[in-house]
């Protein structure tokens, strides 16, 4: 009897704090995934780093042996200055790009990477005035960019996601959940093809030193706003039509980022993912229900859209289809 009471009380305790348990598992899972990534990256990249260090030591020792008039401190001072300039996007190599890093098209490309928080790090402000302006420009520009992307994604999602799903649901009677899943998968496949595979093939042709994997890697790193900066297009030696190429890359990054956000928003609107996300949210109390606090669904990535406007939009979209079905039903009844 006591054991059954204890068991039932434990079950009630777990159910009462189910959201907290799920959140704790979520935090633990994220930390484990972080450690897993660190272990894999370290085991894969550390041997290559060690080989590169050994190769550089051999080259340095051989160079000093062949040029006895040059001391090691002088060589290190020269190399340090060269590396410092390279960090600012300036190279001393004769076959390096002779183009300026701060002409208009390059500055436009830099501004787009700053506002999208991609930040390759290949070109950075050199002067104190440029660094100060970059801070002010980013403080204003990044929220402005988020507002712009929110408005664009909301409008595109209405026409690309909600209307097609609602049409197949009302016109053909398919389950809204099933149509949403199929539509999200198809949209994701089209987006990956148009903004990853095809551009990767184009970059592998335009960039002499890039293969398809490196080009695909650049597309993913850029559109996911990681922006490591190890691959930057348009920086090759004697790049043809460099200005036009830079403008095209800027447009590609902006359109690709919008497409990625539309796909993410489409997946976040799936009923199954909404239920899954609610497992980790704090349940609202009755007092919270009485005041108009933002619902938990809006705390997810899908909060970038105005959900109240979305509901109204869906209602407006459903009216023509419902009216058409009612009129068709009335005509069939009159004919019989």
Curated annotation (Swiss-Prot):
Site entry (Important for increased permeability to Na(+) when K(+) levels are subphysiological), positions: 118
Keywords: Cell membrane, Cell projection, Cytoplasmic vesicle, Disulfide bond, Endosome, Glycoprotein, Ion channel, Ion transport, Isopeptide bond, Membrane, Potassium, Potassium channel, Potassium transport, Synapse, Transmembrane, Transmembrane helix, Transport, Ubl conjugation
Cytoplasmic topology ranges: 1-20, 157-181, 268-336
TM region positions: 21-41, 133-156, 182-202, 244-267
One GO term describing the cellular component: apical plasma membrane
Keyword flag Methyltransferase: no
Membrane topology: Multi-pass membrane protein
Intramembrane bits: 104-116, 117-122, 212-224, 225-231
Modification after translation (UniProt): Sumoylation is controversial. Sumoylated by UBE2I. Not sumoylated when expressed in xenopus oocytes or mammalian cells. Sumoylation inactivates the channel, but does not interfere with expression at the cell membrane. Sumoylation of a single subunit is sufficient to silence the dimeric channel. Sumoylation of KCNK1 is sufficient to silence heterodimeric channels formed by KCNK1 and KCNK3 or KCNK9. Desumoylated by SENP1; this activates the channel. Desumoylated by SENP1; this strongly increases halothane-mediated activation of heterodimeric channels formed with KCNK9.
Cross-link (Glycyl lysine isopeptide (Lys-Gly) (interchain with G-Cter in SUMO)): 274
Protein's name according to its UniProt entry: Potassium channel subfamily K member 1
């Amino acid at each position: 009897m006591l054991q059954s009471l204890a068991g039932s009380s434990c079950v009630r305790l777990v159910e009462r704090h189910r959201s907290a348990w799920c959140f704790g598992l979520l935090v633990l899972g994220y930390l484990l995934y972080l450690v897993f990534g660190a272990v894999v990256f370290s085991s894969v990249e550390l041997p290559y780093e060690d080989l590169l260090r050994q190769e550089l030591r051999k080259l340095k020792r051989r160079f000093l042996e062949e040029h006895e008039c040059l001391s090691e401190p002088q060589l290190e001072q020269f190399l340090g200055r060269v590396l410092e300039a390279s960090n600012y996007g300036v190279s001393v190599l004769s076959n390096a790009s002779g183009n300026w890093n701060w002409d208009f098209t390059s500055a436009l490309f830099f501004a787009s990477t700053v506002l999208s928080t991609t930040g390759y790090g290949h070109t950075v402000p050199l002067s104190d005035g440029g660094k100060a302006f970059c801070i002010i420009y980013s403080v204003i520009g990044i929220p402005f960019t988020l507002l712009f992307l929110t408005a664009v994604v909301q409008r595109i999602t209405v026409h690309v996601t909600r209307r097609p799903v609602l049409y197949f649901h009302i016109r053909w009677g398919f389950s809204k959940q099933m149509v949403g899943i199929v539509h999200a998968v198809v949209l994701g496949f089209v987006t990956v093809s148009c903004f990853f595979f095809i551009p990767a093939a184009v970059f592998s042709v335009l960039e002499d030193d890039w293969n398809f994997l490196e080009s695909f890697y650049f597309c993913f790193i850029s559109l996911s706003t990681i922006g490591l900066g190890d691959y930057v297009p348009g920086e090759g030696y004697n790049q043809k039509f460099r200005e036009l190429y830079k403008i095209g890359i800027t447009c590609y990054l902006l359109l690709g980022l919008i497409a990625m956000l539309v796909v993410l928003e489409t997946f976040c609107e799936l009923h199954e993912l909404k239920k899954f996300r609610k497992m980790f949210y704090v349940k609202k109390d009755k007092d919270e229900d009485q005041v108009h606090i933002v619902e938990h669904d809006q705390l997810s990535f899908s909060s970038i859209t105005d959900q109240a406007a979305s509901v109204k939009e869906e209602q407006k979209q459903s009216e023509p289809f419902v009216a058409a079905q009612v009129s068709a039903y009335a005509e069939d009844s009159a004919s019989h």
